[in-house]
């Protein structure tokens, strides 16, 4: 019997830097592909729907579940990906976004979206708190890998 299945996994690397560019903190965290994200991936096989284009951070602490369609407590507005992103190498897609002075607080969640507001969320994760001041920058590099399970 043939058993076909596809596995999608994501990992994000977070780097927090101070005003002088010194690294204050780094994290590596797994994420959850949400239901809307799985549907988005399937739709891309037959349509030319919108591309993932934005990332958001927030202060939500509830663990991600497949039915999530937004962050629990988004900080500020979603930002577009850094120049040159996303990139693709084989079955790996990497997204990167930088959050500057307009984003402060105790950051505990992040997500990838296909629009500046509303739209489809691809994935969401929560993590241990990171205190971000107005002079700090936070860069999140998020790699999504699709493989045969």
What are these model-derived regions, one by one?
Residues 1-108, 115-149:
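Small cysteine-rich, disulfide-bonded extracellular modules of the LU/uPAR three-finger superfamily
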């Amino acid at each position: 019997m043939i058993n076909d299945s596809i596995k999608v996994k994501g990992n994000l690397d977070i780097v927090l830097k101070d005003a002088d560019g010194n690294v204050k903190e780094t994290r590596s965290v797994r994420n959850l592909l949400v239901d809307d994200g799985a549907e988005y991936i399937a739709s891309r096989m037959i349509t030319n729907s919108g591309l993932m284009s934005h990332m958001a951070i927030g202060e939500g602490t509830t663990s991600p579940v497949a039915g999530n369609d937004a962050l629990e407590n988004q900080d500020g507005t979603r930002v577009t990906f850094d120049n040159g992103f996303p990139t693709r190498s084989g079955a790996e897609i990497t997204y990167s976004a930088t959050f500057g002075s307009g984003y402060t607080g105790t950051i505990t969640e992040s997500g990838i979206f296909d629009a500046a507001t509303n739209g489809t969320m691809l994935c969401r994760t929560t993590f241990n708190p990171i205190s971000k001041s107005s002079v700090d920058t936070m860069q999140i590099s998020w790699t999504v890998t699709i493989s045969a399970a």
